[in-house]
Amino acid sequence: MSILSFLLGEKKKSASVAKERLQIILAHERSGHSAPADYLPALQRELVAVISKYVKISDQDLRVSLERQDNLEVLEVKIEIPQA
C-alpha cells in the first residue's frame, strides 16, 4: 500500500488481501515455526466468509487440505458452487 493510498483511505480488494494472507501463511509454514496445518480451520472460515459475499455456500461446501510429500507442500481448496 502506498502512502497516497493510505492517506486517501483506499481499501485493498479482497483478492489481494487473500493473496497476501496466503503468502504469509506459506512463508510462515516454510520457516518451520508453526505446527502443521494449525491455521487450516481459520483459513477455511475466512474463505467461506469471502466467497459467501458473492455466492451462497455453506461451511460444508468448502474443503481445505494440506498435503506434504518430501519437500513439496500442496494447499488444496475444493469449493462446491451451487448451480444458478
From Swiss-Prot:
<dbReference type="GO" id="GO:0032955">
    <property type="term" value="P:regulation of division septum assembly"/>
</dbReference>
<protein>
    <recommendedName>
        <fullName>Cell division topological specificity factor</fullName>
    </recommendedName>
</protein>
<dbReference type="GO" id="GO:0051301">
    <property type="term" value="P:cell division"/>
</dbReference>
<comment type="function">
    <text>Prevents the cell division inhibition by proteins MinC and MinD at internal division sites while permitting inhibition at polar sites. This ensures cell division at the proper site by restricting the formation of a division septum at the midpoint of the long axis of the cell.</text>
</comment>
<dbReference type="InterPro" id="IPR036707">
    <property type="entry name" value="MinE_sf"/>
</dbReference>
<comment type="similarity">
    <text>Belongs to the MinE family.</text>
</comment>
<keyword id="KW-0131">Cell cycle</keyword>
<keyword id="KW-0132">Cell division</keyword>
<dbReference type="InterPro" id="IPR005527">
    <property type="entry name" value="MinE"/>
</dbReference>
<dbReference type="Pfam" id="PF03776">
    <property type="entry name" value="MinE"/>
</dbReference>
